């Protein structure tokens, strides 16, 4: 053993000792334990239709939409009054409320022996899981929409989104009389992989506008990357692919409805075990989602040139 490492050599009988056994030199751990990379909650922000005058609590909340009267273009007779026209039955949208939640558990032993703070980490994990789970419920409801365009004319992952797809859907939404969500522009949720293809195809196109050129920064959606052909695009990895096919969702006002009996919230459970060692924390809510105006909802299904 050289004089240089006589006190720290971990393979000899030194004061440093052996890592993992006796000795003063051991592995060090950073007490700050990082969380996984996370996507930001996004999709629930587009819900803009909720019950306004709910009559009573119930397991299903029914919303109704009047049907307009037919146009009249005939001239009235001077003497004979027109026949009264019966008004059609309103359309009905049913929102089924379901109970949702998740629970995690901390113990006195875990908190006492852990090198990192456990309770704060569990609170963070539960709060994110709440937002993440509710956003997935919203996405599942949006994917029930019946208006679908397949990029490239196919139904697999080979076609990539193009400007013509955006123009087609914006035209259809306007033809359906769907109201825009930012002036006359429609909201478009897009995965970054798909956004890459659309922006690469239209690089240098003056019709692609950066967000700051059409809206005050205070009114930007999280992840908003620009507007193009009548829609403003918001990137989110939450719009992930299934079997290589990504959904890009376009919607106007009142595309999706939400009813809430209990707003999802974090719950600190009661400590009920005899020695008060187990401390539950979770989230709980009762809510439901459904498409309210299918005419205000479209999606493009496409692959991506940079998909994994």
Question: What are these model-derived regions, one by one?
Answer:
Residues 2-47, 160-167, 200-308:
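Sequence/fold signature of self-assembling virion shell proteins
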Residues 37-100:
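Assembly/oligomerization interface modules of large self-assembling protein complexes
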Residues 56, 64-67, 107, 191-193, ...:
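Structured loops at beta-to-helix junctions and adjacent beta-edge loops in soluble globular domains
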Residues 63, 188, 277-281:
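Hydrophobic alpha-helical segments involved in membrane association or supramolecular assembly
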Residues 71-74, 105, 114, 197-201, ...:
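Short helix/loop capping segments that flank catalytic or ligand/cofactor-binding pockets
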Residues 82-128, 132:
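Long, hydrophobic/aromatic-enriched structural stretches that serve as scaffold segments
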Residues 110-179, 299-308:
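Alpha-helical scaffold segments that mediate packing/assembly in large oligomeric complexes
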Residues 146-221:
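Extended, solvent-exposed, turn-rich assembly/linker loops in the middle of proteins
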């Amino acid at each position: 053993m050289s004089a240089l490492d006589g006190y720290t050599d971990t393979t000899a009988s030194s004061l440093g000792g052996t890592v993992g056994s006796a000795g003063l030199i051991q592995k060090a751990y950073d007490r700050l334990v990082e969380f996984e990379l996370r996507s930001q909650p996004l999709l629930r922000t587009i819900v803009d239709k909720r019950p306004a005058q709910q009559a009573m609590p119930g397991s299903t909340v029914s919303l109704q939409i009047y049907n307009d009267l037919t146009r009249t273009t005939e001239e009235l007779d001077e003497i004979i009054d027109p026949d009264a026209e019966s008004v059609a039955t309103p359309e009905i949208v049913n929102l089924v409320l379901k109970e949702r939640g998740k629970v995690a558990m901390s113990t006195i032993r875990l908190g006492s022996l852990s090198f990192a703070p456990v309770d704060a980490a569990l609170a963070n994990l539960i709060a994110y899981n709440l937002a993440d789970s509710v956003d997935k419920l919203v996405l599942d409801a949006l994917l029930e929409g019946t208006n679908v365009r397949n990029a490239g004319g196919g139904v697999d992952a080979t076609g990539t989104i193009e400007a013509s797809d955006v123009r087609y859907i914006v035209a259809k939404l306007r033809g359906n009389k769907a109201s825009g969500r930012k002036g006359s522009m429609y909201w478009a949720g897009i995965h970054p992989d798909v956004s890459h293809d659309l922006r690469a195809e239209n690089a240098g196109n003056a019709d692609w506008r950066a967000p700051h050129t059409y809206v005050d920064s205070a009114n930007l959606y999280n992840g908003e990357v620009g507007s193009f052909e009548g829609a403003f695009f918001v990137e989110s990895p939450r719009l992930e692919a299934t079997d290589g096919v990504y959904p890009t969702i376009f919607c106007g006002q009142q595309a999706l409805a939400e009813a809430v009996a209990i707003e999802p919230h974090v719950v600190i459970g009661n400590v009920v075990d005899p020695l008060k060692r187990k401390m539950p924390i979770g989230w709980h809510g009762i809510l439901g989602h459904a498409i309210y105006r299918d005419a205000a909802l479209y999606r493009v299904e496409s692959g991506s040139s940079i998909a994994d």
